[in-house]
């Protein structure tokens, strides 16, 4: 199962050449991640300010197939996958409305669950495990 997030490319997302700046693709993907959490009724304010659990990104990558310009309508497909008790990875595909099923960019982020003060790994919260389970297909 996937989560879909729609967004328009804003002028601030682009570089001097008028295309989406590469780092901003990751920011757009992170917006999709946040939207999926919110759609699952996870309180974002509590989630991102939690003093007992933090889920930083430990690896990210992005590949590009075609340019994206200001005003382009994007659909971001988000597909999380669990990697054990304390980490998960999210794969993203970014589609341009006018191109259809061909992706413009692909990205992934790997997240690990830690305690914010000790920085030691810990198990994912029940809330995040439920969110991850909602994407599994049996």
Swiss-Prot record:
Keywords: Hydrolase
Enzyme class label: hydrolase
InterPro entries: DHNA_CoA_hydrolase, HotDog_dom_sf
GO-annotated molecular function: 1,4-dihydroxy-2-naphthoyl-CoA thioesterase activity
Catalytic activity: 1,4-dihydroxy-2-naphthoyl-CoA + H2O = 1,4-dihydroxy-2-naphthoate + CoA + H(+)
UniProt entry tagged with the keyword DNA damage: no
Pathway connected to this protein: Cofactor biosynthesis; phylloquinone biosynthesis; Quinol/quinone metabolism; 1,4-dihydroxy-2-naphthoate biosynthesis; 1,4-dihydroxy-2-naphthoate from chorismate: step 7/7
Presence of the UniProt keyword Hydrolase in the record: yes
Active site (catalytic residues): 15
Protein name: 1,4-dihydroxy-2-naphthoyl-CoA hydrolase
GO biological process: phylloquinone biosynthetic process
Free-text function comment from the UniProt entry: Catalyzes the hydrolysis of 1,4-dihydroxy-2-naphthoyl-CoA (DHNA-CoA) to 1,4-dihydroxy-2-naphthoate (DHNA), a reaction involved in phylloquinone (vitamin K1) biosynthesis.
Naturally occurring in which organism (per UniProt): Trichodesmium erythraeum (strain IMS101)
Stated family: Belongs to the 4-hydroxybenzoyl-CoA thioesterase family. DHNA-CoA hydrolase subfamily.
